[in-house]
Amino acid sequence: MVNFTVDQIRAIMDKKANIRNMSVIAHVDHGKSTLTDSLVCKAGIIASARAGETRFTDTRKDEQERCITIKSTAISLFYELSENDLNFIKQSKDGAGFLINLIDSPGHVDFSSEVTAALRVTDGALVVVDCVSGVCVQTETVLRQAIAERIKPVLMMNKMDRALLELQLEPEELYQTFQRIVENVNVIISTYGEGESGPMGNIMIDPVLGTVGFGSGLHGWAFTLKQFAEMYVAKFAAKGEGQLGPAERAKKVEDMMKKLWGDRYFDPATGKFSKSASSPDGKKLPRTFCQLILDPIFKVFDAIMNFKKEETAKLIEKLDIKLDSEDKDKEGKPLLKAVMRRWLPAGDALLQMITIHLPSPVTAQKYRCELLYEGPPDDEAAMGIKSCDPKGPLMMYISKMVPTSDKGRFYAFGRVFSGLVSTGLKVRIMGPNYTPGKKEDLYLKPIQRTILMMGRYVEPIEDVPCGNIVGLVGVDQFLVKTGTITTFEHAHNMRVMKFSVSPVVRVAVEAKNPADLPKLVEGLKRLAKSDPMVQCIIEESGEHIIAGAGELHLEICLKDLEEDHACIPIKKSDPVVSYRETVSEESNVLCLSKSPNKHNRLYMKARPFPDGLAEDIDKGEVSARQELKQRARYLAEKYEWDVAEARKIWCFGPDGTGPNILTDITKGVQYLNEIKDSVVAGFQWATKEGALCEENMRGVRFDVHDVTLHADAIHRGGGQIIPTARRCLYASVLTAQPRLMEPIYLVEIQCPEQVVGGIYGVLNRKRGHVFEESQVAGTPMFVVKAYLPVNESFGFTADLRSNTGGQAFPQCVFDHWQILPGDPFDNTSRPSQVVAETRKRKGLKEGIPALDNFLDKL
């Protein structure tokens, strides 16, 4: 089955310049898994006849039934470049054999956390775009994530068979379509990238360089300009000069590639290339890309699909394609597949593009180190990562847990960035909350086994050097989802991954049979391990809550919980949306609270953030870890804060990083520093559980105006100050016109023109509003973009399909938080209903607590 043994893989692992770690990313249903098949069959794991139908990397039963990828799956491939191709590689190399660790990731937005986990352990990405529907929302989201992790993209235009057979495009129209997609992708890259002066250099994609592939995953054929340039160089060389050396040949091919794209034209009469669109005698010349590349492909398609027997035979002979005896009898589409697959095999084109243009760990870790490692840039660990040194200290990042066949145990899946990981090695296992020098979230344990991930199988292996992707056994008890594994005593953590979506939809679950409760709790623990994104929370009322990114994500999680993790029947509530609390103006009075012993007083006010600041904090533009003066300057310039106040930010909350700020604007208060920690603790508590219905607060700035304290330290301990600070914060929120915020999805709907009216109807019923509608150039499809409250999104897909006759395809991405119009104190308004429902669900007292509970009189 597999053409190479573990020992051969192990030998290549040491040649770190010849390793490529890459993931396949794209919009949902643009053909990632199908394309991955061509690569896998080239490296000898599926029989080539079945490629395109197997979807080898969809390992789960529900993935095969639904025809979608849910989890990202890793697989190692081995590929040898010919001597001629080696000359195209611009980085260091070591022999001709390459080890490609490929991760096929899901495209569905609900699983974009899986994509993040896949991107963290790879250095390059194959971005797949359907050339009929073009660049979609999810393409942009995953590409943006890739660029943020400093991952080099190459592009693949998939589904060319559709463009030729369904849309029947002319060569020039097809060229324009490709040109437009390349431009769109480059716009995204230049928007989020660091430019040519950045550490990665220029990462724009360009067909001339060979970083764009064209083809069809389903039919199993693909090419880059390099393949055609080679054919023509060979053809022209046969006419004239003798044999070329490999290096000269590579140079020739690279020159040829420049002529095959863009505004270059070919004169078939003279066989010369020209830069003007008309020949000297005034004839209109064809574009080289159309004449020399698309034309032969169109001819093959035309001859075979219109059953022109003689022409087909001629073409097959001319292109020098050897068909098997069984292939010779085929006709129509099966013959087309066989011919195209022999002439332009997808595996070769893509694997060459990957090995030539994607960086090896040696190249990539130089510029990715500063993003990956939290510690100082010059300690042993950082140096080991930068130089990808197998003799350095072990540094390994675990990006996710993979369930094993044995119930309840997990493989830890991740990548070795420095050093060597081996069976039985004693290591430090550090969770995300570990800080150097402290004991919490740190375990010293041996690794039981190291294994190779091979799609549906695992292979044991003795040890794995840096630059490779590996699974570990026996680490799963000590980590929840992600973590760092190291042998270096003073190592800091590898940075935690940033997810592009947040878990905003929740359901409560309980066991149908109360005796099964322990199994449910155990199952929830395993579920939290197996999915990078999901959150499992126990409410104070004893309810078990699961929070996910959307309906589909939750559905899959609950199915996993029931069938794999807890193995018991489960009851679930209707999905509930999490809200945020905020304020809409400044507090109308200065709020005073006294401590329980009446010796200390705090005075505070609350006010809303200027627009955009909360989003900046979410993105990390403004954060607690920034340098003080730099942060103050940013706030003063962009949001017109007073510089003196901006320098006296005490903290962010909840959890020290959230979108609320506590600033100290007191003047000359005694003992202030002694109670700072207590006030901060009260602030974290208050922002985590707001005054209205104990939801997180968002976008509130609290100012401490004045503090009067008892002179004796024993009377101003934490027990006196923390609850007082919390009461005072609540009072200042309640006097500042509190409001609720709800999460909003950005919905992108693709549909034919005639059903656009039906879409507007559904969106209006669901409180959605359309903000952009455009036609996809060159196709009859419309794209409608709208904002839709998450609360209204349940059953939205089904509703939309029934109103449009199943012709509209929605894609929902969490976009932003928006204030729910209405006053929560007015009993008839929507927010007051939400508050009442939430309080009831959480088992709190009915009604928003009165202001008198928090506000004291002098």
Swiss-Prot record:
Domain of life, source organism: Eukaryota
Residues recorded with modification Phosphotyrosine: Y265, Y373
Gene that specifies this protein: EEF2
Domain (tr-type G) ranges: 17-362
Modified residue annotations for Phosphothreonine: T54, T57, T59, T435
Modifications the protein undergoes after translation, according to the UniProt entry: Phosphorylation by EF-2 kinase completely inactivates EF-2; it requires prior phosphorylation by CDK2 at Ser-595 during mitotic prometaphase. Phosphorylation by CSK promotes SUMOylation, proteolytic cleavage, and nuclear translocation if the C-terminal fragment. Diphthamide is 2-[3-carboxyamido-3-(trimethyl-ammonio)propyl]histidine.
Gene3D superfamilies reported in the protein's UniProt record: 3.30.230.10, 3.30.70.240, Elongation Factor G (Translational Gtpase), domain 3, P-loop containing nucleotide triphosphate hydrolases, Translation factors
Residues marked Cleavage (site): E586, S587, K605, A606
Reactions this protein catalyses: GTP + H2O = GDP + phosphate + H(+)
Cross-link Glycyl lysine isopeptide (Lys-Gly) (interchain with G-Cter in SUMO1) residue location(s): K239
Subcellular location: Cytoplasm; Nucleus
Protein name per its UniProtKB record: Elongation factor 2
Positions of modified residues (N6,N6,N6-trimethyllysine): K525
Binding site for GTP: 26-33, 158-161, 216-218
EC number in record: 3.6.5.-
Family: Belongs to the TRAFAC class translation factor GTPase superfamily. Classic translation factor GTPase family. EF-G/EF-2 subfamily.
Biological function: Catalyzes the GTP-dependent ribosomal translocation step during translation elongation. During this step, the ribosome changes from the pre-translocational (PRE) to the post-translocational (POST) state as the newly formed A-site-bound peptidyl-tRNA and P-site-bound deacylated tRNA move to the P and E sites, respectively. Catalyzes the coordinated movement of the two tRNA molecules, the mRNA and conformational changes in the ribosome.
Pfam families hit by this protein: EFG_C, EFG_III, EFG_IV, GTP_EFTU, GTP_EFTU_D2
Main location: cytoplasm
